């Protein structure tokens, strides 16, 4: 039924549950599994007094490198966890807006199922901000499993 799966992880407890579910399904379905982590770009806001903030380029590069280093560590741990259960997985690191990157990689890979963790936000906050899982479920062209 599902021959290619993509699970998105961010190091949270919910994404760990999503990974467990994806590994279980991939093993059961004998499906290919891709594990995706999206590192967000650092956001710099301006000062309300001057309207200008100077951030040295090397500092921004250091932040990007640390974000990527942490993301690669999360991916490596996830790959090891999958291997322990007998599932070989590929890992993908991307930068950008998580929902957008998840959908792009799902389309690129031709996946038949996307697995994401629920962020657990609800009510007004979700209505105002939205959640990655909600955006992915609304915009995906393939089934999405949201794990709680």
Swiss-Prot record:
CDD domains: USP-like. Keywords: Signal. It comes from the Bacteria. Residues 1-18 form the signal peptide. The keyword Transferase does not apply. Belongs to the universal stress protein A family. This is Universal stress protein YxiE.
